[in-house]
């Protein structure tokens, strides 16, 4: 009897799990839209450079060139622009009407007939030229005149100060009047001086009377002679 060898269980190796794919970060909807737009955007066409001048300049040129006495209608202006500038007139028509309305209000264009953007239009007559250099010196002259008048007014306003001088002049006049009085007073003593001169004449006359005392001296002996007569009694 043969013994059977014990079976050895070999561990079964598990197959390695397949690596899970890395999760890609979720794209935001905004970025996704931008990416789509970037991919779908086509190169922009450059803006067409206008081959004609501004509407205002074209309309003014049309009115000056046509120069109709009764004014030019919008239809005539359109024809002129098409013939001269070769423009798509239907696209420019709203701008033409807008310019005409504004120019009429500002006085840049005269509306002969109609109202608004309908009717006929023409350019206003040229304004008369005024010689500005001639008018400018006149203004300067007026300014100088006003300055001179102001200075004269200031001088007139300052004239009340001499009134004080007049008041001071009055005492001077009184002094002048007092001086003649003093002269008169001085003249009076001058009149007295002749009297003083006359007094020496009187004094000179007095010595003539001096011989009289000499006559009186001889009379004294007569009295002395009389005294002895009394003793005889």
UniProtKB/Swiss-Prot annotation:
It is found in: Nucleus; Chromosome. It comes from the Eukaryota. Residues 17-29 have a biased composition (Low complexity). Its main location: nucleus. Residues 128-137, 146-155 have a biased composition (Basic and acidic residues). The keyword 4Fe-4S does not apply. SUPFAM superfamilies: Winged helix' DNA-binding domain. It holds the Pfam family Linker_histone. One of its GO terms (cellular component) is nucleus. Residues 172-213, 223-233 have a biased composition (Basic residues). One of its GO terms (biological process) is nucleosome assembly. This is Histone H1-I. InterPro entries: H1/H5 (IPR005819), Histone_H1/H5_H15 (IPR005818), WH-like_DNA-bd_sf (IPR036388), WH_DNA-bd_sf (IPR036390). It comes from Glyptotendipes barbipes. Histones H1 are necessary for the condensation of nucleosome chains into higher-order structures. Keywords: Chromosome, DNA-binding, Nucleus. One of its GO terms (molecular function) is DNA binding. Belongs to the histone H1/H5 family. Residues 51-125 form the H15 domain. Residues 1-55, 115-233 are annotated as: Disordered.
